[in-house]
Amino acid sequence: MDALKRYDPEVFAAIQQEVERQQRNIELIASENFVPKAVLEAAGTVLTNKYAEGYPGRRYYGGCEYVDIVENIARERLKAAFGAEHVNVQPHSGANANTAVYFAFLQPGDTVLGMNLAQGGHLTHGSPVNFSGRTYNFVPYGLDPETERINMDQVAELARQHRPKLIVAGYSAYPRVLDFKRFREIAEEVGAILMVDMAHFAGLAATGYYPNPVEHAHVVTTTTHKTLRGPRGGAILCKKEFAKEIDKAVFPGMQGGPLMHIIAAKAVAFKQLSDPDYRAYCGQVVKNAKALAQALLERGYRLVTGGTDNHLMLVDLRPKGITGRDAEHLLDRVSITVNKNAIPNDPEKPMVTSGIRIGTPAMTTRGMKEAEMVQIADLIDRAITHRNDEAELDRIRAEVHELTARFPLYAD
């Protein structure tokens, strides 16, 4: 980055500080990961100079013969990884992908079933503060109060009662496997389209460590970062019968020119999906999550649903007498990065919360395994237990830096 350093030292300095933060911190935000250097390089290419409205072979600009090659590579790799009939790799984000699906199949005011944000859903699944909840009539489904798992009987009952045009299955903070077969049966019963938002678990689904929603859903959306370990972006996978509607909804419906440099980075990331090393990585993500969850349980923490089937867990901090916001700030002081997160029926405000969400994808990318997860649980517990002891917090921070130094980011 010599040119950047010379031309804009202020921005360069901020980027370098972020590099250092990523290197020294234990990154436990479930939606974050570290992309391979090849993905970084692809995202920083001259493809950012090229406008390419339209699709390969059908562009509104000349000079697209090489970006067509790149987009086709990305499409074919994603299709192969999930066994999809059609894909669109142009959405700029997961939110844009969800928006495009709604735009393709719904009219303003149409009824949709989506998971309640307060119980693990996503903003774009019908939150009243989001465009989705303001544009469409979202009916929220939630969790069984006893098991804290999705109440599929409630989903079926709400579907029969409200006859939604679309049912959304997916989450941002739910640690268990979704029953895609049951969701599809409910959708068929009421004549609804089933959309699965697999943003969080896409990498696990591509490698057999989570059910593949493409087998049951009419349409699937995803981000391309998180467990896919690619650039920030989105994608849509669907049945061939919906290809025209989806493509028209993305362009010209929701977006103009695609980000061809990011599509190149997506293509590189999708190449991982057929790599045995990546499959082993996804398996380790799940093993690490189970190990970290068990270690926290053994230290007296309550986990929503009692554990995890995927890459994340939701920790209820009320028994420890600390809010999610305060825990996030506390752990940040010792170089452990988490995010505050509401727990089911959380009595605290959304910017305070009673819990934190923890995920294992990022530190698994750096090579950590079960033993390190136990160590991380111990560091978290010691920080929370001794949160008013500055000397102990200093010792914990030093131990964190010693641990991360053993697993360097971009070692070469």
Curated annotation (Swiss-Prot):
Q: Where is this site: Plays an important role in substrate specificity?
A: H225
Which cofactors does this gene product need? pyridoxal 5'-phosphate
What is said about its interaction partners and assembly? Homodimer.
**What is the recorded name of this protein?**
Serine hydroxymethyltransferase
Classification of source organism: Bacteria, Bacillati, Bacillota, Clostridia, Eubacteriales
Subcellular localization: Cytoplasm
Q: Enumerate the UniProt keywords alphabetically.
A: Amino-acid biosynthesis, Cytoplasm, One-carbon metabolism, Pyridoxal phosphate, Transferase
Q: Example GO biological process term? A: glycine biosynthetic process from serine
Show the InterPro entries listed in the entry.
Answer: PyrdxlP-dep_Trfase, PyrdxlP-dep_Trfase_major, PyrdxlP-dep_Trfase_small, Ser_HO-MeTrfase, Ser_HO-MeTrfase-like, Ser_HO-MeTrfase_PLP_BS, SHMT-like_dom
**A single GO CC term, please?**
cytosol
Q: Which organism is it from?
A: Symbiobacterium thermophilum (strain DSM 24528 / JCM 14929 / IAM 14863 / T)
State the family it belongs to.
Belongs to the SHMT family.
Question: Where is the PTM N6-(pyridoxal phosphate)lysine found along the chain?
Answer: K226
